[in-house]
Amino acid sequence: MFDIYDYSPRLVALGLIAATIIIYSFTLTVYRLFFHPLARIPGPKLCAITGWYEIFWDVLVGGQFTFKIEEWHKTYGPVMRIGPNEVHFNDPDFYNELYPTIGATYEKPAQWRWRFGCGTAIFDTIGHEHHAQRKAPVAAFFSRQKILQFSGFIQDQTDILVKRIRDDHRGQVICANEAFDALTMDIIGYYAFGLSYNSLQYPGFKAPYRNVTADIARMVHVGAHFPWVFTILNALPEKYITRLLPPMSKIFMFRKEISSQIRRIKDNKEYLDKNVNEHRTVFHEILNSNQPACELNEGRIYHEALSLVGAALETSKRTTALAVYYILATPGVEDNLRAELTAAMPDKTKNLSVPELEALPYLNAVIKEALRLAIGVSQRMRRYSPTETITYKDYTIPPNTVFGMCHWEQLRDARIWDRPTEFLPERWLAEQPLALNGQPLNKYFVPFHRGPRMCLGKEFGMAQLNIGLATLFRQDDIKLELYETDRKDVDVVADFFVPLTVKESQGVRVLVK
C-alpha cells in the first residue's frame, strides 16, 4: 500500500505542477474551441487551439504554413481561423476593404517585430502613428519625382552590367540572380550611403554579399517565434557561431558593413555637408529630419539600413531574374519584346526615360507578369485594430484580433486570373484588361501591397525593372539562352516572408552568345 508520506515534498510539488499544467491546458483548449470570440469562425481545430501548429509547418517543416492556409481555404471557405487569435481571408474583392489606402489605423502584431533582427525599422514598427512618423522622411526620398531624378544613375549602372556581359562573359554561363543582385547592390548602396560597392566588377558577378538576403530570410520564422534565439546569437562570439552555422559568416559581414556606413554618415558631419548637394542619401534625409533624438540613434538607423537594403536586394533580384527566365522560356515573348524595343529605340545607344519606357505596352505587360509571379512578399500581411471591428459577410471580427491576407493567393487566384500560374503578358494588352469576374484586372494587382504600409520602394523597383529589361533586351549583339534552368529555378516552394525556390537551385542561369 502506498502512503502519501512515502513521497518526498519534491515529488509532490512536481505532481502538483504537472496537474496544474494539464488542467490549465485543458481549460484553455475548451475556452479557445467553444467560448473564444472567434469560436464560430471555421478552420482547423489545431490552429484554434495553439500557435504551435504554425511553428510546426514554418520552423520544423520549413516555410509551409502559407501553403497550408491556401489548402485549408478550399475546405473551410473564404474566412478562416488560423490561430488562437488570428483570422485569414481569401476573397479577392475584400482585399481593398481590408487594406484601405485612406482611413486605416491598423497596427502590426508585436510578436513579429524581431523576425529580421531589426525591430525598430519602419517596416516592423507596431503603432500606426509611430509608423507614419518614421515613414515621412523616407517616403519623400522614394517618391516618383526623386526616383526619376535618380534614374540616370540606375541607367549608368545598368549600362555597366550590359557592357560586362558583352565584353567579359560572351560564351560563358552567368547566373541572372547574381548579376541583378550585384546591380541592385551598387544602385541601392549609392542611393542609401553615397557610395558604390563595385559589385558589378567581380568575376561572374559573384560579389561578397550575393544571396545574403536569402540566408537571412531562412531564419525569419525562428526569429518570429523564438526571438530570444537572436539575443543568444548576438551574445556569442562570432567565430563559434560561424563554425556551427557557416552561412552566418556572410550575414555577419553584411551587418558589419551596413553598421560601418551608418556610423560614417552619422558621425562625420563634414562628409554630410560636403555631399549634400552632390547626392543627398536617404540616411542624410533621416538624420537631418525633425525626428526626436531617440529616432536618430545609431541602433535605430542601423535597423532601417538593414531593412531597406535587404528589401531592395531580394525583391529586385528575384523579379528581374524571373522576368529573364520567362522572356527566354515562353515562346514569342522575347521576339515581341525585342521588336517593340527596337522600334522605340532605333539607336540602342540613346536610352529612353522611365516614363517613355512605361509607355511601351509589351514591356509594361512583361513587367506586370513578372511582378505577379515573383510575389515580392509571400507571407500574409498581419494587422490588428485596438478599437475597430472588422465585418465580413455575417462574421464579426472583434478588436485586437489579428487578421490578414496573402499576396500569394491574391496574385494567383483562379477566380480572377486566367491560367494563373502561366506567364501571359497578353492578359495586359487590352485597352481595359479585365479579370475573369469582369472587374478591372488592376484592382487585383497588388505586388506592392496596398494601404498606408504599402511598399516604399515601388517607384525604385519599377524604375530598375524598366531600365534593366529594356537595356538588356535592346542589345542586338547579345543573345541569352537558358542553361540547365527550368521552372524549378523560379517556382516558389517555401515561404520565408519572401518566396524561395528549392535549395538545390542555382538560380536562372543563361549562356551569353
From Swiss-Prot:
- Which residues are sugar-modified? 211, 351
Give the stretches traversing the membrane. Answer: 11-31
What GO molecular function annotations does the UniProt record carry, in alphabetical order?
A: heme binding; iron ion binding; monooxygenase activity; oxidoreductase activity, acting on paired donors, with incorporation or reduction of molecular oxygen
For this entry, the protein name equals Cytochrome P450 monooxygenase orf3
Check the record and name the PROSITE patterns matching this protein: CYTOCHROME_P450 (PS00086)
Q: Which domain of life is it from?
A: Eukaryota
Binding positions (heme): 455
Q: Which PANTHER family match?
A: CYTOCHROME P450, P450, PUTATIVE (EUROFUNG)-RELATED
Q: What class of enzyme is it?
A: oxidoreductase
Encoding gene, per UniProt annotation:
orf3
Recorded hits in Gene3D superfamilies, A to Z, give: Cytochrome P450
What pathway annotation does it carry? Mycotoxin biosynthesis
Query: What cofactors are annotated for this protein?
Result: heme
> Which GO cellular component term is one of those annotated?
membrane
Give the chief site where it resides: membrane
Q: What does the record list as GO biological process?
A: mycotoxin biosynthetic process
- Species this protein is from: Eupenicillium brefeldianum
InterPro entries xrefs: Cyt_P450, Cyt_P450_CS, Cyt_P450_E_grp-I, Cyt_P450_sf, Cytochrome_P450_monoxygenase
Induction remark: Coexpressed with the other cluster genes on brefeldin A production optimized medium.
Q: How does it sit in the membrane?
A: Single-pass membrane protein
Q: Which UniProt keywords apply?
A: Glycoprotein, Heme, Iron, Membrane, Metal-binding, Monooxygenase, Oxidoreductase, Transmembrane, Transmembrane helix
